């Protein structure tokens, strides 16, 4: 970390993670080049998760697709960071953060995923083809399940990137709640690269370069892209703020990403109910779904209670 005798007064500009009198460029001219590269690399892998994440919702719907993908992301994202850090930096003893309480939380999370998966299977077997298409146009449980698991695994690389970039900040000069913001920026840059390459590939494959000249669609596209980006990024800004309040609890700090994903699952299923994706399912199926959601919520807080 940066532990030089820099002024402690904060800047009032938008660079919340950068002390007054310093610039973001100083972070990238440090000896953290390996961490910077690894943080961006896992951002690239996370970008793959983002691409497949959309497909999981296409084939499973918002509720089931997000539940399986984000549940897998929560469990693996929590474990992979310390494991990979221990491989590259054994002197940090990162595995020590994977306490019995944390492992129990992850296991309970995976149980919650399994229960929600059972609810999805029950939905697939109980509805007619017409009902399935009415709820989710391209519903395909086996295909969607495989894609959702892949999306969850790759999306977990976001938290791994944050783990490798944890020290890319100005140390004590940066408030705890802002310390992960530089790493978050690097991970999202890596994800942007993946998505940009894929979009350009699709443009070339489908010969749709001319669509960029259709000025009539630019207004709505830019507006909703900005809105989606702001709303989506706010969760990771909230993650950074939340970690700042959890520094006294190593267990909750390690599980913070898992907690965020669990809350995503809860609200995605609320939207799934609002959008009537579970319309026509038996009461038993709904009960199983709710049980899975409750298990995921419990998994976020159980380790702290043990």
Please provide the spans of the model-predicted regions.
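Polytopic alpha-helical membrane proteins, predominantly small-molecule transporters/carriers
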Residues: 1, 9-306
């Amino acid at each position: 970390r940066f532990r030089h005798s820099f002024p402690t007064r904060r800047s009032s500009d938008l660079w919340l993670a950068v002390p007054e009198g310093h610039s973001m460029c100083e972070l990238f001219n440090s000896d953290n080049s390996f961490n910077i590269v690894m943080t961006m690399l896992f951002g690239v892998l996370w970008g793959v998760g983002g691409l497949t994440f959309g497909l999981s919702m296409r084939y499973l719907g918002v509720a089931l697709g997000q539940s399986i993908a984000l549940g897998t992301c929560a469990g693996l994202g929590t474990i992979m960071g310390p494991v990979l850090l221990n491989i590259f930096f054994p002197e940090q003893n990162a595995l020590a953060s994977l306490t019995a309480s944390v492992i129990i939380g992850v296991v309970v999370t995976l149980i919650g995923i399994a229960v929600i998966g059972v609810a999805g299977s029950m939905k697939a077997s109980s509805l007619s083809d017409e009902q399935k298409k009415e709820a989710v146009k391209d519903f395909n449980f086996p295909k969607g399940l495989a894609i959702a698991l892949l999306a969850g695994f790759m999306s977990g690389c976001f938290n791994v990137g944050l783990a490798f970039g944890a020290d890319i900040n100005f140390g004590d000069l940066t408030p705890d709640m802002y310390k992960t913001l530089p790493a978050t920026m690097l991970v999202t840059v890596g994800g942007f690269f993946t998505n940009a390459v894929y979009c350009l590939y699709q443009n070339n494959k489908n010969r749709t370069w001319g669509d960029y000249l259709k000025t009539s669609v630019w207004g709505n596209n830019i507006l909703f892209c900005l809105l989606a980006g702001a709303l989506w990024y706010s969760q990771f800004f909230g993650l950074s703020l939340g970690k700042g309040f959890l520094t006294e609890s190593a267990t909750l700090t390690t599980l913070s990403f898992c907690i965020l994903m669990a809350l995503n699952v809860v609200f995605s299923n609320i939207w799934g109910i609002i959008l009537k994706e579970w319309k026509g399912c038996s009461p038993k199926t709904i009960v199983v779904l709710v049980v899975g959601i409750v298990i995921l919520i419990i998994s976020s807080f159980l380790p702290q209670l043990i």
